[in-house]
């Protein structure tokens, strides 16, 4: 199976952040990773691959080297995408004989694209098993819902950018009739439990659209959730393919980037530093050696970037702008929305050059602020040189996004080279990698 088809399978099988984390963990355990639990003491073995999960939606994987290591080579991406979260009181009666699902927006999505297309629901539920509470993933794997738009005959402004009210216009149709509790019954059946054992839910809408390849020569890929599952996939593949050198490789997949990252499983948490400190302790590093290891560390923050739009090139900076299929994008911002500086940009560019991977550069147009990402958030907790990168795409945060088919291979190749390096500083302050 080639890289694009493997990516498509990962995208199609990861309708929510919970499924994305579960599929990433499954790939790691298939490669021999030993699962650790934060609530237990760790005993680390040399040469062993490990994975630890938090909140069913974030994970950190690492491989303990056979010998001493200088520091940590880290990469981070995120498992979530803009969508709609189903409320705990899920059913909402509406005009006529229809029953709608009560939802609210999650993140900053382009919501109009969600209208008039088949949708469904997936996520995690908490259930009672005897005297235990356990989480279980669910996916209603069929065309279940639709958010109907208003006919042009009733709203002549529909093609003029009419504003959508999420409390009025964006509630999906669930069914006909007023049968109370029908949705809860459906979820309990999907979880394989009796209704009284279904205690709580975290469910999200997802489009039923599958990932596809388009273009005269298959140059493009079109799929939901490319931001940021394309980077999750590329970093994961590179992490698994690498042959570690003198640094300890670490892969972090965070959740909740689309809503600010300030959750216990987000980049603005202690998750990564908690894991690194426990690695240091398990490898016998004292406080002084731990600080030296951090000083000899590096991070790649991987979150997709904006390509120049064929219909609106004016939104791009007039200098250098990324194109689909043109390679990995290094992102820069004077106000530190991206963490790339001269040092981190040079390190990653040099690695890509040696790996034969093309590099592009991106800066927001000076009068368009753009968004922030994982790098500047995580470095507030762990002060290491960090480069913000991504793969170029169009229609970011739309229900379906477009990217270049060749770029995923570039990311896998670059991350394989990156995780195989030995990054540290010499006695003169120079960087050895």
Label every PLM stretch briefly.
Residues 1-433:
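N-terminal hydrophobic/helix-forming segments and targeting peptides
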